[in-house]
Curated annotation (Swiss-Prot):
Function description: Then it catalyzes the NAD-dependent ring dehydrogenation of precorrin-2 to yield sirohydrochlorin. Finally, it catalyzes the ferrochelation of sirohydrochlorin to yield siroheme.
Sites where the protein binds NAD(+): 22-23, 43-44
Species in which this protein is naturally found: Salmonella dublin (strain CT_02021853)
GO molecular function: NAD binding; precorrin-2 dehydrogenase activity; sirohydrochlorin ferrochelatase activity; uroporphyrin-III C-methyltransferase activity
Name of protein: Siroheme synthase
Key word Transferase present: yes
Keywords noted in UniProt: Cobalamin biosynthesis, Lyase, Methyltransferase, Multifunctional enzyme, NAD, Oxidoreductase, Phosphoprotein, Porphyrin biosynthesis, S-adenosyl-L-methionine, Transferase
Region (Precorrin-2 dehydrogenase /sirohydrochlorin ferrochelatase): 1-204
Residues the record lists as Phosphoserine modifications: 128
Keyword match Nucleotide-binding: no
UniProt GO BP: cobalamin biosynthetic process; methylation; siroheme biosynthetic process
Pathway field: Cofactor biosynthesis; adenosylcobalamin biosynthesis; precorrin-2 from uroporphyrinogen III: step 1/1; Cofactor biosynthesis; adenosylcobalamin biosynthesis; sirohydrochlorin from precorrin-2: step 1/1; Porphyrin-containing compound metabolism; siroheme biosynthesis; precorrin-2 from uroporphyrinogen III: step 1/1; Porphyrin-containing compound metabolism; siroheme biosynthesis; siroheme from sirohydrochlorin: step 1/1
EC number: 2.1.1.107, 1.3.1.76, 4.99.1.4
Superkingdom per UniProt: Bacteria
């Protein structure tokens, strides 16, 4: 380990920055946020420094570097564009045993500045030891996406409860189990983010009153249409907190690779070599695992409330009194149309869009008369096997035979394939496509040649 990561308490302590440009301004902003009593020494200053000085936030000393300014300092930063001056600052700080950072010259510095993820009072620092600042920045950006913005509020509230937790729970094991339950409670986190004091208090009292081995919960998460980059941040957070993930075949391998490594995985989909797990059995798996006290994620392709049978699964949990929540996902209609260059609505061609299941209950019938109406876009889910029937019915109820159609196979993924034609060809086109696939019918399909972008990548 080349550097010891430490967090410095600088509130009301003297610090010095030498330099008055943009780089110095960025460093000054960090020190001011930390509450430092800041002096800035430079020949010239960008306007922001004058603003801060006029507001009494820092002191400006105009002129060449004055090393006596270091005499009362705890920490210094050299941020000029003159290497000679920066080295003088470093040497003067070293002689006084004051830690000094030299911007873009880690070998001349006694400390380096990390990339920071600020969820105060929770702080995360990332450093490459000065060898690769860009890598440190990329890691910081990834961590920023993983850590909820309200995490700091949760940490601050936890600090307020420490004495009560210590008093109520006698052993370290009990306290640990309580805090694990506390920090994964989405209702509490959301209530804190919304400043809903009544809900915060109610959830807190429930956490303290529940036995530590209480039943778990189920989170219904939409995985999106395929591209792992379309998984929501909240969805990513949930699958990385799960004890067990129950998933179907529409969830891509790229997304499953993001699941917490030691989480159990239960496949309940239908694909070659596997039998389809009946819906009732899936419901019982969710119920059984939650009753063991586990955090269960039910991971579904697309959005769980759009032809995902999510409502049926939650009804079972609701009846059993199991806590649950839902994280929406980008539905296949949105993802596949966007990645195919087909806008679902358009001022000239479609004022509405209909999402339709092509997989009906026995004896079921769609409202073909309204589906055949003009100025709308139809998106059929699970419609490949019924493509010929869809073609026949729409034409029979008055839709023009030359209406553009498109079938999107493996939408949003690197395997995406789009075939298109007109309505009279729909049944034939469906023979060229494999599931999972989506059928889009409407004049907007004609814009594909102009708006297609994904196939160019």
């Amino acid at each position: 380990m080349d550097h010891l990561p430490i967090f410095c308490q600088l509130r009301d302590r003297d610090c010095l920055i030498v330099g008055g440009g943009d780089v110095a301004e960025r460093k000054a902003r960090l020190l001011l946020e930390a509450g430092a009593r800041l002096t800035v020494n430079a020949l010239t200053f960008i306007p922001q420094f004058t603003v801060w000085a006029n507001e009494g936030m820092l002191t400006l000393v105009k002129g060449p570097f004055d090393e006596t300014l270091l005499d009362s300092c705890w920490l210094a930063i050299a941020a000029t564009d003159d290497d000679t001056v920066n080295q003088r600052v470093s040497d003067a700080a070293e002689s006084r045993r004051i830690f000094c950072n030299v911007v873009d010259a880690p070998k001349a510095a006694s400390f380096i500045m990390p990339s920071i993820i600020d969820r105060s009072p929770l702080m995360v620092a990332v450093s490459s030891g000065g060898t690769s600042p860009v890598l440190a920045r990329l890691l910081r950006e990834k961590l920023e996406s993983l850590l909820p913005q309200h995490l700091g509020q949760v940490a601050r509230y936890a600090g307020q409860l420490r004495a009560r937790v210590k008093k109520q729970f006698a052993t370290m094991g009990e306290r640990r189990r309580f805090w694990e339950k506390f920090f994964v409670n989405d209702r509490l986190a959301q209530s804190l983010a919304n400043a809903d004091e009544k809900a915060v208090n109610a959830t807190t009292e429930r956490l303290f009153s529940e036995p530590l081995d209480h039943r778990g919960e189920v989170v219904l998460v939409g995985a999106g249409p395929g591209d792992a980059g379309l998984l929501t941040l909240k969805g990513l957070q949930q699958i990385q907190q799960a004890d067990i993930v129950v998933y179907d075949r529409l969830v891509s391998d790229d997304i499953m690779n993001l699941v917490r490594r030691d989480a159990d995985r239960v496949f309940v989909g239908k694909r070659a070599g596997y039998h389809c797990v009946p819906q009732e059995e899936i419901n019982q798996i969710l119920l059984r695992e939650a009753q063991k006290g586990k955090r269960v994620v039910r991971l579904k392709g697309g959005d769980p409330f759009i032809f995902g049978r999510g409502g049926e699964e939650l009804e079972t949990l609701c009846h059993a009194g199991i806590p649950f929540s839902v994280v929406p996902g980008i539905t296949a209609a949105s993802g596949c149309s966007a990645y195919s260059g087909i806008p679902l609505t358009h001022r000239d061609y479609a004022q509405s869009v209909r999402l339709v299941t092509g997989h009906l209950k026995t004896g079921g019938e769609l409202d073909w008369e309204n589906l055949a109406a003009e100025k709308q876009t139809l998106v059929f889910y699970m419609g490949l096997n019924q493509a010929a029937t869809i073609q026949e019915k729409l034409i029979a109820f008055g839709m023009q035979a030359d209406m553009p159609v498109a079938l999107v196979e493996n939408g949003t993924s690197v395997k995406q394939r789009v075939v298109h034609g007109v309505l009279t060809q729909l049944g034939e086109l469906a023979q060229q496509v494999e599931s999972p696939a989506l059928i889009i019918v409407g004049r907007v399909v004609g814009l594909r040649d102009k708006l297609n972008w994904f196939s160019n990548y």
